[in-house]
């Protein structure tokens, strides 16, 4: 038996494992090869198949039905976590603070929206190039449990909106609720709220 057909199958599989940095970063992920950031395979995957949750971050739920020609522009975002909190930076060049709306909902959703209005054409104007994007933009983020929703602060500088969110102290983070299963003869039990450790 020749080893050549076996090598043709084995070599791509080994390259796939090496590109994904497996098994160091798998950690019980359903998608161990593409779930690890900064790997060759994750970069190739994300270019071809965008993350559906990131796509949903940009879809506004409140678009009116009488606005069929609404234009959504993309606002680029960076989000980092520090020991003290979270910092979200949104590119909003050319906008003033009155053009931007920031909302925090009780279900831990942070929304940033706004509109970049197109310059009105004056009689006699002839555009040679139009590359800047105009229209409404919308980004929303599901905030982690450790964010203090009352601590959100925003500032704008040089076309960048920076949102700062402080972390809750460990004893104030609510853990998952444990629900007991009862049988027909048993009395219903209380719901217990465990603290995250």
From Swiss-Prot:
Ranges for domain sHSP: 68-184
PROSITE patterns: SHSP
UniProt short sequence motif Prevents secretion from ER, positions renumbered to this chain: 194-197
Gene3D superfamilies: 2.60.40.790
One GO BP: response to stress
Subcellular location: Endoplasmic reticulum lumen
Key word Nuclease present: no
Entry keyword annotation includes Signal: yes
UniProt keywords, alphabetically: Endoplasmic reticulum, Signal, Stress response
Residues passing through the membrane, by range: none
GO cellular component: endoplasmic reticulum lumen
Signal sequence annotation: 1-28
Subunit architecture: Forms oligomeric structures.
Stated family: Belongs to the small heat shock protein (HSP20) family.
Protein name: 22.7 kDa class IV heat shock protein
Species of provenance: Pisum sativum
Gene that encodes the chain: HSP22.7
